[in-house]
Amino acid sequence: MSMFGLFTCLSIYFSGVYVFCSKRKHLLVVLLSLEYIVLSLFMLIVLFLVEFDYDYFFPVIFLVFSVCEGALGLSILVSMIRSHGNDFFNSFFLSLC
């Protein structure tokens, strides 16, 4: 595995984790950072599989599950915006009282 590819994947992963931890008030930004993290993990898996000559069925299954995760996140975002008018987590929890 090339060091440049590994460094790129890890820097993308840690920047996604940083955005996920620092901008957690908006659901859309959280979902985008989660997709960013999934993309970096996919790149890391593909680099690992190319390096050791394994078969490529696992990345396809990984992409299917990540697409399902993205679709579920977007459906939660749409239902939250329809019911509350925005994607702030604070307004969502205040209306439960």
From Swiss-Prot:
Gene3D superfamilies on file: 1.10.287.3510
Q: Looking at the record's lineage, which domain of life comes first?
A: Eukaryota
Its localization reads: Mitochondrion membrane
GO annotations under biological process? ATP synthesis coupled electron transport
Alphabetic keyword roster: Electron transport, Membrane, Mitochondrion, NAD, Respiratory chain, Translocase, Transmembrane, Transmembrane helix, Transport, Ubiquinone
Give one Pfam hit by family name. Oxidored_q2
- Asked if Cell membrane is a keyword of the record, the answer is no
What's the protein's topology in the membrane? Answer: Multi-pass membrane protein
Q: Does the keyword Translocase apply?
A: yes
Q: Which residues cross the membrane?
A: 1-21, 28-48, 57-77
A molecular-function term among this protein's GO annotations: NADH dehydrogenase (ubiquinone) activity
Q: Which GO terms describe its cellular component?
A: mitochondrial membrane; NADH dehydrogenase complex
Provide the catalytic activity annotation.
Answer: a ubiquinone + NADH + 5 H(+)(in) = a ubiquinol + NAD(+) + 4 H(+)(out)
Record family assignment: Belongs to the complex I subunit 4L family.
Function in brief: Core subunit of the mitochondrial membrane respiratory chain NADH dehydrogenase (Complex I) that is believed to belong to the minimal assembly required for catalysis. Complex I functions in the transfer of electrons from NADH to the respiratory chain. The immediate electron acceptor for the enzyme is believed to be ubiquinone.
What is this protein's record name?
A: NADH-ubiquinone oxidoreductase chain 4L
The gene designation is ND4L
